[in-house]
């Protein structure tokens, strides 16, 4: 296991240890470098960076996809950022939404109601509703950033929404958000 600041073994060494070609190692290192997990230092080698300070949001998604737990502090901070962004998304959607944006949200709310009535979780509808709000902002950057949060927490939301009460509570919040956006309030 490597820690921040550690020098990685040579490409040849890594290839031998992992039973792959050097080309495969080079490709993997390029991906890790683009995600800011490692840095190449000329005439020195490849070093592990402090990912808590320098990694890209892509790494957060990868970490979630691989089922690697973040720290409680990481999770709290991610939810804090998501909450800030979603509040701003609702404000922008109130000003910029179109009738077709409202129709999309209305359809998602109806689908979620149907899922709840059947005792099914609404994790997909939850994501779709929030992404419909993001689309209504007409801000492509905000939409992409919010997408990262939904990718990060996809598996957690499946568990969260397996509880019918949570689904109902979430649906109630969604209705209030929809009404505020509809009223431009």
Label every PLM stretch briefly.
Residues 162-165:
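Structural signature of alpha-solenoid helical repeat scaffolds
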Residues 78-159, 169-180:
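Conserved amphipathic alpha-helical segments that form helical-bundle/coiled-coil interaction surfaces
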Residues 10-11, 138-140, 184-185:
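Short loop-to-helix capping motifs
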Residues 1-84, 91:
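Short linear motifs at protein or domain termini
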Residues 1, 177-185:
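Short, intrinsically disordered, charge-balanced linker/junction segments flanking boundaries
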